[in-house]
């Protein structure tokens, strides 16, 4: 990071490390997937193809992140369990939850056509994620039992509901019929009215799906699969690097929290621990802890900052222009515009390179200010939009692998401190862009990267400007403002003519579309010209 007088704003960042010996679970849920399923005409009560898509995405997550050793999912949710010794991203909660949600969203978009070849993806899917911290393997067992119980109850209810709706009843009539019904009553309703034996329904619907890694190289068993080799990364030319390693296994079990199921798989109790006994009733206090959500301080400005994950490699593989690829920056800006259009509580965004900072209004109650939901929703929506709009900005360049972004949320108590944060990011933009412009011009002139770094070591702004001017004929201040200033995204105000009774026309300001600007946001003039952005008087 660049050193500046604004660096103090980093002191407002809060550590969110999940401490040992707690086990880490990342649970993701589809954001407003009831609407998503309606728009894309999923079958009710269960769409087998959409569930297989979710399972395929979860499998990709296990391949991408070796520290994730177990996953359980049903409907539009999945829970990913990290091995007990994991130090993934220093166990920082916001980073982990946002990264998993982002990658899952990217893979969901990537695989959509594979599972729905004749259905257009109408809009960007997104996911909310959270960290569940389990103090022991017994708590993990209770969590898994809780999720599978919820799978069973939800599926049984939904099966009854949709069979009644298909028989001609209205949704409200159906809900009234099912109100306060118990498990046995719902089973009888299905059998007596529709001839359905609930226990004979596909296990995929009733039991959910679990994935875990096994050392077996190849085998064939009902409901599980794995390959002989996998792509673990891509080299500098974008070619897949394949390597034999533990396989991810997909199974359906009546009791994923059962001692017999868990302990028969040596990889599970090695990575996570033994289940000493079967679980009976789930402790209510455990459930309360699973549902706990940390909230951001009220009446503070919240900044959700997202950063591309390993974007140095991503830019090399996709042959972005150096030091700046204008199309890549415009793609980022387009995604930021989409975020502001999707989330009305976001008032402003500032971006440079592979990062963007989104400012929520200080009075925002988005997701009841639940930190994890806000971060993951923004990051995953940004990611899936990036995937869907790639072809608009790179029509002749294939996306070789899905990108991912991590995020964090920081509270700033006053507007002055918020503006200092934004100034810090723009100062950083200038310093990094000036350095990178010099660096890549030196490399293109024949110097090695190490030689270019040594040449620039200890140089100041004036010296870099002279280098560009004297050696390469480049006036730094004449470079495109999108490179030098970064991008500001906000809702524009336009003048609308209003005819008064006396016949005079006065101007009335109305909010219009979201736009992109390349201004100096350190200067107070910008904020004075656009007081509506942060509701300044």
UniProtKB/Swiss-Prot annotation:
Record keywords, A-Z: GTP-binding, Magnesium, Metal-binding, Nucleotide-binding, Nucleotidyltransferase, Nucleus, Transferase, tRNA processing
Cofactor remark from the record: Binds 2 magnesium ions per subunit.
Signal peptide (UniProt feature, chain positions): none
Cellular compartments annotated: Nucleus, Nucleoplasm
Entry cofactors: Mg(2+)
Residues bound to Mg(2+) 2: 307, 354
E.C. number(s) listed in UniProt: 2.7.7.79
Protein name per the record: tRNA(His) guanylyltransferase 2
Lineage of origin: Eukaryota, Viridiplantae, Streptophyta, Embryophyta, Tracheophyta
């Amino acid at each position: 990071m660049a050193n500046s007088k604004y660096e103090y704003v980093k002191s407002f960042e809060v550590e969110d490390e999940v401490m040992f010996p707690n086990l880490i679970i990342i649970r993701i849920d589809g954001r407003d997937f009831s609407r998503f399923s309606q728009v894309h005409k999923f079958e009710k009560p269960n769409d087998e193809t959409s569930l297989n898509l979710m399972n395929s995405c979860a499998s990709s997550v296990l391949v991408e992140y070796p520290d994730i050793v177990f996953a359980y999912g049903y409907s539009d949710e999945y829970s990913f369990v990290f091995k007990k010794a994991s130090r993934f991203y220093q166990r920082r909660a916001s980073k982990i939850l946002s990264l998993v949600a982002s990658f899952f969203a990217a893979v969901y978009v990537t695989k959509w056509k594979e599972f729905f070849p004749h259905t257009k993806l109408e809009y960007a899917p997104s996911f909310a994620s959270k960290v569940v911290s389990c103090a022991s393997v017994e708590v993990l067992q209770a969590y898994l039992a809780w999720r599978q119980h919820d799978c069973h109850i939800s599926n049984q209810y939904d099966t009854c509901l949709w069979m009644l709706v298909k028989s001609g009843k209205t949704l409200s009539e159906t809900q009234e019929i099912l109100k306060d019904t118990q498990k046995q009553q719902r089973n009888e309703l299905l059998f007596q009215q529709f001839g359905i034996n609930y226990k004979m329904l596909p296990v995929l619907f009733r039991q959910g799906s679990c994935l875990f890694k096994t050392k077996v190289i190849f085998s064939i068993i009902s409901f599980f699969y794995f390959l002989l080799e996998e792509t673990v990364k891509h080299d500098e030319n974008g070619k897949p690097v394949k390597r034999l390693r533990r396989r991810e296994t997909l199974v359906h079990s009546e009791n994923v929290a059962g001692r017999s199921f868990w302990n028969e798989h040596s990889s599970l109790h090695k990575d996570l621990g033994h289940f000493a006994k079967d679980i009976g009733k789930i402790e209510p206090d455990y459930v309360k802890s699973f549902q706990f959500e940390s909230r951001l301080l009220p009446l503070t400005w919240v900044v959700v900052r997202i950063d591309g994950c390993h974007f140095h490699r991503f830019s090399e593989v996709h042959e972005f222009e150096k030091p700046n690829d204008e199309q890549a920056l415009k793609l980022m800006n387009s995604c930021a515009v989409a975020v502001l259009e999707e989330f009305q509580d976001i008032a402003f965004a500032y971006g440079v390179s592979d990062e963007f900072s989104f400012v929520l209004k200080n009075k925002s109650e988005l997701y009841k200010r639940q930190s994890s939901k806000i971060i993951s929703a923004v990051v995953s929506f940004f990611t899936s939009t990036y995937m869907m709009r790639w072809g608009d900005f790179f029509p002749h360049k294939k996306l070789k692998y899905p990108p991912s972004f991590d995020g964090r949320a920081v509270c700033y108590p006053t507007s002055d401190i918020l503006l200092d944060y934004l100034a810090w990011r723009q100062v950083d933009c200038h310093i990094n862009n000036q350095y990178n412009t010099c660096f890549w011009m030196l490399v293109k002139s024949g110097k090695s990267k190490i030689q270019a770094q040594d040449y620039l070591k200890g140089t100041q702004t004036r010296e870099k400007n002279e280098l560009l001017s004297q050696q390469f004929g480049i006036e730094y201040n004449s470079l495109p403002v999108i490179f030098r200033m970064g991008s500001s995204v906000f809702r524009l105000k336009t003048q609308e003519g209003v005819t008064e009774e006396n016949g005079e026309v006065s101007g009335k300001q109305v909010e219009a579309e979201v736009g992109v600007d390349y201004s100096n946001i350190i200067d107070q003039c910008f904020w004075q010209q656009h007081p509506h952005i942060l509701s300044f008087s």
